[in-house]
Structures are given as structure tokens and as C-alpha cells.
Amino acid sequence: MMESRHAQRKNEHLSLAAKYYDQVHQHHYFDQVRLIHDSLPEMTTDDVDLHVQLADNLEIECPFYIEAMTGGSDQALKINRQLAQLAHKHHLAMATGSLSIISKDPQSFSSFEIIREENPDGIIFANLSANASLDQAINAISLLKANALELHINAAQELIMPEGDRDFNWLDNIQYLVSELEVPVIVKEVGFGMSKTTIAKLQTHDVHLINVSGRGGTNFAAIENRRNHDINFESLLDWGQTTPESLLEAHSIRRGKTEIIASGGITSPLDVIKAGVLGARAVGVAGYFLNILQNEGYEALDQTLGEWQVIVKRLLALLGCSSFTELSRVEYVLGTDLLSYARQRHLR
């Protein structure tokens, strides 16, 4: 049976993400962050606890997790099944791709449902657009028995997308969903990063979990521009803030019980640690894990996830930190470009 045009678009996204993977990873922005070594950590690896408390009712067993990738097609179902199996095995949280498609193509739900089937007791974040209705949000959470809801904000992607939305009045709806839902709400960019202005707006609208999702990983500007045969948005291919820049922005404005999550261009356990040093409470990884799964296979990703957990724990011990949250006290220096950005933005 031929898949719907919505499912075909999801397959296009997967294909183009793979096509542009090497291109978007030519620049590794976390190289602009250097950690200061202390030769006397006074710590054992047994002292390290990887658990992270993101909210009163949301704890994850490891500071990095499998970030939102895909859903809505047969190909996505296969990918989500494998990712969910690995999330279950390694006790990792996992975010779904956008569930917005199920209101237009109800048959696509099986590609999301498989995540809960393969990981019945794990931490799962459902994912919807920031303009989702309360009924859509409640339905998505209920169908997946989700532990949290990600609301993605993706104005740049939508504007480049030929069939994208053109209305970005999101803040009031976000605040309404936060107030009405029983699970924590994470507001997430999709690879364009956040400024301190954005983060301040979210905080004043009662958002306390913010994923800055910076430039450096999957590039939806490039993906949607390739799909757009009418207008060329090539000038926006490097639009937005990188993940380190976004974390510095967040650190300058974060207040109260707001917790920052990082994603975008995370390709190593050291990147996870550096994100924590810059203020992230947790770190999402999507493109890097998907690339391994698609090109090297299930067993290779299985091995990678296990190794990352071991390395993150050992790096925490090396830095004298018994938990991921203690990374905020680790000293660091910035490379020339990132330091210049921070000074011009009055971030340090």
C-alpha cells in the first residue's frame, strides 16, 4: 500500500538527513570549549551517580538520551523499534519524532506506538508542535503513556518548508499547555539554537524545561531547502546559534527552577560533559546515533551506547564530580570565536 504524502515527507527527511550528515558535521563547535584538568580529582568511579532529576516527577537514569528523530512511516517504524529496544537495554530516555502527523494520518501511529511496546517501563518524551491543541497533547501523552511532552519550536524550518506553517504565535499556547498538562513540558528548538531573549520569554510563560537545540547537528534548513523547488533559501543554511553559544545564552538568563537541556551536534561523550559544564542538565543525541544505526547497524549502536555510559561516568570521576549537575563548577576556557561571541553578547 502506498504511504501518505505525510509519511513520504518523513522518509524524505530521513534520506536528506543522511545525505547532509557529513556536510553539517564539518564544523565541531564543542572544540571551542576546553576543560581545565585537575590532577587530584579525589574521586572514585563508584562515587559517580548518573541519575538526573529534570523535574519533580521526571528522573532519567543517564544524563544523555535518544533525542527526537522520526515517526510516521514504515521506515520510521523500523528505526523507532530498534532505538526503543536499545533505550530499554541501556535504560536511556527516548523522545519520539513529531506526533503531529497522526491527526492527519491516523495509521501512522503504529510507528510511534512501537516505542512504548518495545520499552514498556522506560522514560519516553512525546513530541508535538508548539501550536498543538490541548486535546492533541493529552491524546499523544495518553497513547504513549509518555512521561513528558516536548513542544518543538521551529519557525526557521517552517518558513523554508514549502508546505510549512506561517503563523508563529506560540507563547500563549505553550503557557496554556504547561498549566493544563500533568506531565512536564519541554520546549525544544530543532537545531537553530536559542538566545537569552527566547529563554527569557519562555521563563516568563512558566516554561521550566528548555532544550536549546543548537546549530551543529541535523540541519533542517538544508533539508527543507532541498525539498523546496520554488524558492532558494540557501542563505539560511547557517542560520541560528550553535549549541555552545546557546548554552552560554541560557546560562546568562536562567533563573529559579528552570533546567536547560542541550542537543545539536553532540558526537562524543566529551561533548556531553562539555554541555554539562556549560550548564545543561541533560543532553539529547539524535543525528549521531541515527547515522551509526543506518550505516553501521544495530550492534554498532548498541556498543556505542554502552561505551558512552562508561566514558561519561569516568569523565565525571576525572573531573571530580559525583553527579552530572556538579559539572557546573568545572573550570573551562573558550576558543577565540566562541569567546568573541560571548563578549559581544555580554554573556561573560
Curated annotation (Swiss-Prot):
> Which Gene Ontology MF annotations are present?
FMN binding; isopentenyl-diphosphate delta-isomerase activity; magnesium ion binding; NADPH binding; oxidoreductase activity
Q: Can you say what this protein is called?
A: Isopentenyl-diphosphate delta-isomerase
Q: Give me the reactions it catalyses.
A: isopentenyl diphosphate = dimethylallyl diphosphate
Q: Which InterPro entries match?
A: Aldolase_TIM, FMN-dep_DH, IPdP_isomerase
Tell me, what's a Pfam family for it? FMN_dh
Q: Where are the transmembrane segments?
A: none
Q: What is the lineage of its organism?
A: Bacteria, Bacillati, Bacillota, Bacilli, Lactobacillales
> Where in or outside the cell?
Cytoplasm
The GO biological-process annotations, alphabetized, read as: isoprenoid biosynthetic process
Which positions in this protein are listed as binding FMN?
A: A68, M69, T70, S98, N127, K188, S213, T218, A286, G287
Which sites bind substrate? R9, K10, Q157
Chief place of localization: cytoplasm
Per the entry, what this protein does is: Involved in the biosynthesis of isoprenoids. Catalyzes the 1,3-allylic rearrangement of the homoallylic substrate isopentenyl (IPP) to its allylic isomer, dimethylallyl diphosphate (DMAPP).
Give the enzyme's main class according to its UniProt record, as a single word.
Answer: isomerase
Question: Where are the disulfide bridges?
Answer: none
Family statement drawn from the similarity comment of this UniProt entry: Belongs to the IPP isomerase type 2 family.
